[in-house]
């Protein structure tokens, strides 16, 4: 990276809590919420940012980006299976012991403690996981619940690179359909 002296580099507030939503709103800056690992506060943070936003020299209106986990496969079952890699990554972060991305498993409950399994379930509850039709329904529901989101950022920990690429292509199809229907 190079210093951006005399460049107009936009400043964003990146956050995963309501505190960051308050800061972004008060400063009149774009806000990026880390819903991929902090979904519990996402709804409240989005609401706070939009309701308390103060126009600034940077922005006249709020600009909201949300990052979500996304795994889109041919079937819901295949997507759920592939998403077990993502769940393992989340648990690894929580344990404080990052490890290489692990292959998906048919027995997630068998490799996690009951507490870790519940944590993974909670952290994945706002994720876009499923077939294209399922993810489209989830995304439309998300947009209806949260109103205007300016950008969606997706993260996808899929073990197999070809499956990951296919997942991103399917997600692109879904987003195109959702955008065309609005």
PLM features per residue range, with description:
Residues 1-27:
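Internal, glycine-rich beta/alpha segment that forms the wall or movable "lid"
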Residues 6-9, 125-126, 158:
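Short, contiguous strand/loop micro-motifs
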């Amino acid at each position: 990276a190079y210093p951006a002296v005399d460049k107009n580099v936009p400043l964003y507030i990146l956050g995963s809590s309501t505190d960051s939503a308050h800061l972004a709103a008060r400063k009149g800056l774009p806000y990026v919420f880390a819903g991929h690992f902090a979904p519990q506060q996402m709804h409240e943070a989005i609401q706070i940012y939009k309701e308390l936003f103060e126009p600034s020299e940077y922005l006249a209106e709020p600009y909201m980006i949300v990052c979500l986990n996304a795994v889109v496969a041919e079937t819901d079952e295949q997507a759920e299976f592939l998403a077990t890699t993502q769940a393992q990554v989340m648990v690894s972060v929580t344990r404080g012991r990052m490890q290489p991305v692990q292959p998906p498993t048919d027995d997630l409950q068998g490799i996690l403690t009951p507490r870790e399994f519940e944590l993974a379930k909670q952290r994945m509850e706002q994720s876009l996981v499923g077939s294209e039709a399922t993810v489209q329904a989830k995304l439309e529901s998300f947009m209806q619940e949260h109103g205007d989101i300016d950008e969606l950022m997706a993260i996808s920990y899929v073990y197999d690179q070809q499956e990951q690429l296919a997942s991103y292509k399917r997600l692109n199809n879904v987003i195109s359909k959702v955008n065309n229907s609005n």
